[in-house]
Amino acid sequence: MSRICELTGKGRQVGHNVSHANNKTKRLFLPNLQNVTLLSEKLDRSFKFRVSTHGLRSVEHNGGLDNWLLKQSDTKLSARALKVKRELVKASAA
């Protein structure tokens, strides 16, 4: 299971631990991923995603999953999120 947010594309970053003596050792900074169930109001269904807490705050800030997916570019979304976005576009067109 990859450590990438399904909605924002946020993944791991590489950096250093720096000691008091300025010795540097490589380390990973992992995103805070949570398994969440988000409700789509237009589709009247819920979807499970593995989302970073940053992504979850962004979804809530934009007024829910539907608005977030319609605003977000396709390149950052996972395959499952893209599928939901296509369903939303199809439902809103009908």
From Swiss-Prot:
GO terms for cellular component: cytosolic large ribosomal subunit. Transmembrane segments: none annotated. GO terms for biological process: translation. GO terms for molecular function: structural constituent of ribosome. The keyword Ribosomal protein applies. Keywords: Ribonucleoprotein, Ribosomal protein. Disulfide bonds: none annotated. It comes from the Bacteria. Gene3D superfamilies: Ribosomal protein L28/L24. Belongs to the bacterial ribosomal protein bL28 family. PANTHER family: 39S RIBOSOMAL PROTEIN L28, MITOCHONDRIAL (PTHR13528), LARGE RIBOSOMAL SUBUNIT PROTEIN BL28M (PTHR13528:SF2). NCBIfam families: L28. This is Large ribosomal subunit protein bL28. The gene is rpmB.
